[in-house]
Amino acid sequence: MNIEKVTFISPDLPYPTLVTHALFAEFGMPLIATIVRDAGYDVKAFVEHIGPVKWDQVMESDVVCFHAFSASIPTTVEYIKKIRAARPDMPIILGGTHASVMAEDTLQYCDVVIRQEGDETLPEVLAKWREDKDLSDVLGVTYWDNGHVRHNPDRPYTHDIDTITDLELIDGYMDWSKPKLLWKQRMRFQLLQTSRGCPFACTFCIAPRELGQGYRMRSVDSVIADIKYQKDLVGTRYFFIVDNHFTVNRAHSKVLLQRIINEKINWAAVCFTRLEVSRDDEMLRLLKQAKIGTLYIGLESFDDNVLKLLNKQQDRESIEKAVKKIKSFGLNVLGSFVLGSDSDTVESIRKTIDTAIEQDVDYLALFPLSGYPEYNAPTIPLNRFFMPTWDKLDGNFVIFLPKNMKPSTLQREVSASYKRFFSPKQILRKLVQRKFYGALKRLGYAIQVWEIRKASNKRADYLETIEGQYYDENEQLIESMLGEEGVHPAQFPGSSMGAGLENAVIGGD
């Protein structure tokens, strides 16, 4: 097969999220595009929230590769149909979290699914096709073989993660001038990866399935070069470190932080980490000096029963102590919370938000419990999922039947919690504390979450029309109404997901 032109497409998400107003090049797809370009192919990359897909260029491709989040699967399928209508024989490849978890379901729309990391797998697939060889010995793929689905063994996780992404491969990336950013109400954020994997196994988290629990570190020299490259390219100082847990290997993190300090890198960064970071004073001091000023931490809840169910290995007392310690070093805490587990009630959710305010958590991100049918069964039983379409699986919408409240109630609690945390009263509180920059950032967050709240309330209105038969007068789930297969875990037009689940009782809004 003649393969020279390879095009990558990442469709936009259909609903607002906490990063809707951020302009950034999502990490995975542009990196894989860079690796494929370096392997000798003519590469084009379209990230739709940066710029529109240029379909004339897509149709001239030899292979089209999609990176799709679950919420963008419906759009991805539309785009694939558009390509197939014009180029019926165009080879199409899908990758990303959704494809990794739902490989066989995703395969119905494409020729090959790249599972988990694509750094080595995609170049190998392209090389095999160039040589007209089959994919029988390619690890990490699910593909069609004469009408049969082949699911090859997983590929060992990639250890060479030092490649610096060429951001100029992304069509339109350099077209965002400061006036355009201001006009479109967008703010540049650069993404940086210093490691992959997470050694923890929280029951609700998909990261171990996608990137593995084997923790791999990028070389310090490569990280520093990447920071400098991105700063020089676009002139911004705002970075988000996308590692699942930036401080897992404390010795490595400290070497990197000291190097950032020594290099006098002028930036402002956010990183993901865990509460354990609070036990290391030197780490906290280095984070502050290295200008990684906000720690994004999965607090999840201030209710001990919820924390135990989620396997977080932390309790309310340890969270409060850790938050106080982190903030004493002048660092901000962005706490994320998972709402709606079987140990959650309306009262426990409200107490969690009240405690977050009392503990002076600086920012928060709220997520109704989510996941994939079967994979997240320990946290959400299979018979309690309902997803009429994948577009609601973006972390903001309720996609299951909670045990202790109706779905609409949980959806409205998300909206109300955002409203309370980012209220004018709380912004004024920051001003009284003379935390002027913090007040300004809270105001910015309030504007962003307003869009989420609007979509959340609309979803709640719909849920109210279809949930009643499953709950008693105290909003307790009547599990006998569900049966073994329960409500439909997903019904997407033409989808095989949930095939055989005839009792599709919940539709879409």
PLM features per residue range, with description:
Residues 2-8, 37-42, 57, 89, ...:
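Radical SAM enzyme core and accessory elements
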Residues 15, 200, 251, 305, ...:
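Flexible glycine/acidic-rich beta-alpha junction loops that bind and position SAM and/or redox cofactors
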Residues 168-334, 341, 354:
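Radical SAM [4Fe-4S] cluster-binding motif and immediate context
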Residues 12-13, 138, 144-194:
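N-terminal [4Fe-4S]-dependent radical SAM core
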